[in-house]
């Protein structure tokens, strides 16, 4: 058949063009040409096998293009769905599923962190995710990525899995991994396990035991008030790692956080006898501890007890710094002694100290709480002129607005809200929700709706809620009086009615002239 030869040659040319071309457009256009001519004879079996591979090549290139355009958040969500879909599955099966579904994706640290944060219920399925990462040739673990898994298992209090991860990456785990492990153990309330981990971490997990790691462990323990265990650990390792002044200051702060002032003074005495200098940081911690104990037991003893600590600082030649004044001002404001705090604020320059951002923020909150609104606004202006205006973020403004709404100063809260926006600070969901709730409580629904529309225009997703109106601001409903029901007279009304009736009776006995007599007259 003569027409069959050109058709076969044309098909072979088309097949060569399919094989040589790699773009998606040629792959989409050529099948249309073939299907548009029904006169062509069918391909031989050998050629059909080659042509049958084209759809798979087309779809794989399409998925690669899509995977490059996908956002990292969407990829993390798909990873999380895969992990939480079957959390009881074995790690090998999870790794195989990831190889089948996500072989075209190259993981990075941000993607791993997002996936683990979105999958709190995955549990041990995260080990399968970790195996898939190990099998991926384009990825290699670092100290940071290992710390992500350590933090994940520690957050779930699965410390067995956490230790498995650390021992698996013995040569890779470093300072970040150690910090995550210690932090999770301390926050879980296992200080003894922390000391055991520190003793054998160099042999079992390849983590260095040096002064830096000891300082980290002591700091984490003392932040949660486990100063006794931290002090024992420091004394046991003193022959290997001799403590410095920083470690001693951390131990004093740990005793002060636990509100054990006697132990803190004992340790300070041992430090001074051992040749260590007690610095301003240690005295500030003891001063804060004294203020806390006085606030709890007897606030009137605050001033004499504070003076004792300050006199000891002067006797030992320890200078005051800004943190010293911040401790005093903060504790005075907590017991509503704002006037004394303002006096102390004015005397900071006598000791060569300048207020910082924390000083201004504490005083602004205290002044607003005391309803000294004008002075609070002046303090905000002073803070800006001192160069700390950038630290007035939406979190701090939210605290100011919450205080003003709490003392029923809604109008001033709205003026602070306007100045917040004028300074370039964008309010968030909590700020709008707070003001809308207060306006609805004051029965100002129109203004609340205006705020809701403003938030919607800015793209802030404020969810509408049911706000209760304060009964003080509700309009009192007038009771409808039924005219058929006889109203009970009051005593003045009854007296007036009796007087009127008596007058009528008295006037009835008076003889009145006739009309004819009036006309004659």
UniProtKB/Swiss-Prot annotation:
InterPro entries xref list: Mito_RNA-Proc/Resp, Pentatricopeptide_rpt, TPR-like_helical_dom_sf
Residue positions of motif Nuclear localization signal: 486-503
Phenotype seen when the gene is deleted: Embryo-lethal at a early stage of development.
Region feature Disordered, mapped onto this chain: 480-499
Composition bias type Basic and acidic residues, residue spans: 480-495
A GO MF label: mRNA binding
Biological process annotations from GO: regulation of translation
Subunit structure as annotated in this protein's UniProt entry: Interacts with NAP1;1 and TCP8. Able to bind mitochondrial RNA in vitro. Component of the mitochondrial ribosome small subunit.
Function: RNA-binding protein that functions in both mitochondrion and nucleus. In mitochondrion, it is associated with polysomes and may play a role in translation. Required during embryogenesis. In nucleus, might be involved in the regulation of its own gene expression.
Similarity comment: Belongs to the PPR family. P subfamily.
Name of the featured protein: Small ribosomal subunit protein mL104 (rPPR9)
């Amino acid at each position: 058949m003569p027409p069959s030869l050109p058709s076969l040659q044309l098909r072979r040319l088309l097949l060569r063009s399919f094989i040589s071309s790699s773009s998606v457009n040629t792959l989409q256009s050529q099948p249309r040409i073939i299907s548009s001519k029904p006169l062509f004879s069918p391909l031989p079996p050998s050629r059909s096998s080659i042509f049958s591979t084209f759809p798979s090549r087309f779809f794989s290139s399409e998925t690669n293009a899509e995977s490059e355009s996908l956002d990292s958040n969407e990829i993390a969500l798909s990873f999380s769905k895969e992990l939480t879909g079957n959390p009881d599955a074995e790690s090998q099966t999870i790794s195989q599923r990831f190889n089948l579904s996500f072989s075209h994706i190259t993981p990075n640290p941000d993607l791993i962190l997002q996936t683990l944060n979105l999958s709190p219920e995955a549990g041990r399925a995260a080990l399968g995710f970790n195996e898939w990462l190990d099998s991926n040739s384009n990825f290699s673990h670092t100290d940071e990525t290992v710390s992500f898994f350590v933090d994940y298992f520690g957050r779930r209090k699965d410390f067995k899995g956490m230790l498995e991860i650390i021992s698996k990456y013995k040569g890779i785990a470093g300072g970040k991994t150690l910090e995550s492990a210690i932090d999770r153990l301390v926050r879980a309330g296992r200080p003894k396990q922390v000391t055991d981990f520190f003793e054998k971490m160099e042999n079992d997990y390849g983590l260095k035991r040096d002064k830096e790691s000891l300082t980290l462990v002591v700091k984490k323990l003392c932040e949660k008030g486990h100063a006794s265990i931290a002090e024992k650990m420091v004394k046991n390792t003193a022959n290997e790692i001799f403590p410095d002044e920083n470690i001693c200051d951390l131990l004093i702060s740990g005793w002060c956080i636990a509100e054990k002032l006697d132990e803190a003074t004992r340790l300070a005495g041992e430090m001074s006898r051992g040749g260590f200098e007690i610095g301003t940081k240690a005295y500030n911690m003891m001063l804060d501890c004294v203020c806390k104990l006085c606030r709890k037991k007897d606030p009137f003893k605050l001033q004499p007890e504070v003076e004792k600590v300050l006199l000891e600082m002067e006797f030992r030649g320890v200078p005051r710094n800004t943190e010293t004044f911040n401790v005093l001002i903060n504790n005075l404001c907590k017991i509503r002694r704002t006037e004394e705090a303002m006096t102390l604020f004015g005397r900071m320059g006598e000791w060569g100290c300048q207020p910082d951002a924390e000083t201004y923020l504490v005083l602004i909150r205290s002044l607003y709480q005391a309803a000294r609104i004008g002075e609070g606004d002046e303090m905000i202006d002073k803070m800006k002129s001192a160069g700390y205006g950038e630290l007035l973020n939406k979190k701090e403004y939210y605290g100011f607005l919450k205080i003003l709404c709490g003392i029923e100063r809604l109008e001033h809260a709205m003026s602070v809200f306007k100045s917040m926006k004028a300074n370039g600070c964008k309010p968030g969901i909590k700020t709008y929700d707070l003001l809308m709730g207060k306006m609805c409580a004051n029965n100002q629904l129109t203004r609340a709706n205006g705020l809701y529309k403003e938030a919607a225009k800015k793209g802030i997703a404020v969810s509408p809620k049911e706000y209760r109106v304060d009964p003080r601001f509700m309009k009192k409903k007038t009771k409808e009086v039924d005219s058929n029901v006889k109203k009970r007279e009051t005593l003045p009304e009854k007296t007036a009615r009796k007087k009127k009736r008596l007058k009528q009776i008295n006037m009835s006995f008076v003889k009145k002239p006739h009309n004819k007599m009036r006309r004659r007259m």
